[in-house]
A protein has these predicted regions:
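Cleft-lining beta-strand/loop regions that shape enzyme active-site pockets
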Residues: 3, 20-31, 35, 39-52, ...
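Hydrophobic membrane-insertion alpha-helices, especially the h-region
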Residues: 5-21
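Amphipathic alpha-helical interaction segments
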Residues: 37, 54-58, 62, 239, ...
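Extended, small/polar residue-biased N-terminal targeting/export presequences
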Residues: 46-107, 153-173, 177-183, 496-507, ...
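Hydrophobic beta-strand signal
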Residues: 127-128, 304, 329, 344, ...
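A generic structural motif
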Residues: 157-161, 336, 376
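Polar, glycine-rich mid-to-C-terminal structural blocks
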Residues: 289, 301, 312-373
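Conserved functional hotspot residues or short segments at active or partner-binding sites
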Residues: 342-343, 347-519
Length: 519
């Protein structure tokens, strides 16, 4: 095997390049020689044939895993997908999908894409691709079969609820945008809502457009939802904060070993007229760039932070491209908020790093706050360090369901989504607009009985009394999916907010957010 043959020369090159500068360097050289011996022994003597490329890749992954939870190795295949995610586009047909009952099921066609132009609808099942059955297709196969170069075509056969005959469609692939913003709308006549899913290269452009639209609709206060936003590009997060800051305040600073990793990022003292109050909503899934935004809003007293203590990912990674198309993502610095708080939470035991995320001691109550280091905001308020962003107002999402409710909501067949398809046409015929539907339609009485009968027909086990306990939440999930099917994703999220206790908590704290900015 070529790589094994050349390993001794690679090691010699490293030695000649760096030299024996210390006993540590000599020890490292010996360890590298030992590694070469082990690789050769395994390749020549192991009882079964092994894929040495896979083993060597595992060794690389193991090396980086020893550093911290976020330094990692990315294969060439993964690098391409990640690049598409951060670039904000890929080439394909443009659907959001899930796999239900073995088939690709359309959650929604992305507006303006080939699937949208061809008339694909929420609930459509793709049963054949290029005249071959798509039954029991995997997520990986979906990407391989439906993505492809712009201008190439793919034939799909659609099974649509309520229509007996399948529908044959030829889709010509195109560039597909990956939107950072999942939803942007007015909750009421003064409150705007924006949910950011990730920070990609298009995020600033998207949020600029969304803010402009909401301001034109009369927005006087903003709920910025960063829950379960795992982060993304640091520069996009900094630019978003910059939109709301009118002085040359520090937004973020980083510290590392190499000189270029020590940076201070300041606001540009812009003239954008965004003097309305902001409430930022975070949870344990808010990480990295989300914590840059929420931490800066909090430290600069520009917005009130509501929710749960965030993830605590404050390590800056730099991606180093390797010759085979793979990438080494290596931590080069740490993030600090304007007040000096380290965003990164401790990771001495990497094995427990993710397991500890769900512990109750991350709550923002008096007993846990007493154990955290205290920092001071621009206007002298106390904020807390120790990893992650501790919210100003603690609000935990209430999802403590009984067994029957939990089984319905977490079922792999997405039962609330499926039942929404059963009642969509009835509602579409009855209501011309979302507002009337949201105000007058419910699933009580005979409609509830219809749902319970439908569950029985699906052979789903449940206790009626248990579903009764959480019926308001269950019907909200169903009706939100109906709204999404008929009026689009914006209305799915608008309906979901009605039963979202964290969002409802956030809405009652705008007076405090208003006081922060002197209004």
């Amino acid at each position: 095997m070529k790589i094994i043959k050349y390993l001794p020369y690679i090691i010699l090159g490293v030695v000649l390049l760096y030299g024996f500068k210390s006993d540590t360097a000599r020890d490292q050289f010996q360890k590298m020689k030992t590694l070469t011996q082990i690789i050769r022994l395994v390749s020549e003597n192991y009882v079964e044939d092994v894929d040495m490329n896979e083993i060597l890749e595992g060794a690389i992954i193991g090396l980086l895993d020893k550093l911290d939870p976020h330094s990692n190795y990315i294969s060439s295949e993964q690098s391409e997908l990640i690049s598409q995610q951060f670039d904000g586009e890929f080439e394909g047909i443009g659907i959001e999908f899930t796999i239900l009952e073995g088939y690709i099921t359309v959650i929604s066609p992305i507006p303006g894409t080939p699937s949208d132009r061809a008339g694909l609808q929420t609930g459509d099942k793709i049963v054949r691709i290029n005249d071959k059955s798509a039954y029991k297709i995997t997520q990986k196969d979906v990407l391989q079969k439906l993505r492809g170069p712009k201008g190439s075509s793919v034939d799909v056969t659609i099974s649509r609820p309520g229509i007996d005959e399948d529908i044959a469609v030829t889709l010509v692939r195109d560039k597909i945008p990956i939107f950072s913003i999942l939803a942007s709308f007015m909750i009421d006549n003064q409150t705007g809502y924006i949910k950011i899913n990730q920070f990609s290269r298009t995020t600033v452009k998207e949020i600029t457009e969304s803010l402009s639209e909401l301001e034109n609709l009369g927005m006087q206060q903003l709920l910025l939802d960063l829950r379960n936003n795992g982060g993304g590009l640091m520069d996009q997060a900094i630019s978003i904060v910059d939109m709301f800051i009118s002085s040359r305040d520090t937004i973020l600073f980083t510290k590392g070993k190499i000189p270029e990793s020590n940076e201070v990022f300041r606001a540009r003292k812009n003239n954008m007229d965004k003097n309305y109050p902001v409430v930022v909503l975070i949870n344990r899934g808010s990480a990295s760039a989300s914590e840059i935004v929420s931490g800066a809003f909090q430290d600069l007293d520009r917005g009130l932070v509501v929710g749960e203590t965030s993830f605590g990912k404050g390590l800056v990674q730099r991606q180093y491209p390797l010759r085979d198309g793979s990438t080494a993502r290596i931590t080069i610095a740490r993030y600090y908020t304007p007040s000096g708080r380290l965003i990164q939470r401790p990771y001495e035991d990497i094995g427990e790093y993710y397991a500890n995320l769900g512990e109750n001691n991350r709550e923002a109550n008096d007993s846990t706050l007493a154990k955290k280091p205290v920092f001071t905001t621009k206007n002298g308020r106390n904020v807390y360090g120790g990893g992650g962003i501790t919210p100003d107002i603690f609000s935990e999402l209430i999802l403590d369901f009984n067994k029957s409710t939990r089984n319905i909501l977490s079922h792999p067949d997405r039962l609330t989504f499926k039942f929404a398809g059963e009642i969509k046409n009835e509602i579409q015929e009855q209501y011309d607009n979302f507002d009337d539907f949201a105000r007058f339609y419910d699933l009580n009485g005979n409609r509830k009985e219809k749902f319970l009968s439908w569950l029985q027909a699906q052979e789903i086990e449940f206790e009626v009394e248990e579903l009764e306990e959480y019926w308001d939440y269950i019907q909200n999930q169903i009706l939100s999916n109906v709204a999404g099917r008929i009026w689009g994703k914006e209305f799915l999220y608008k309906k979901l907010l009605e039963a979202d206790n964290q969002a409802q908590d956030a809405l009652i704290h705008f007076d405090e957010a208003r006081k922060l900015i002197g209004l």
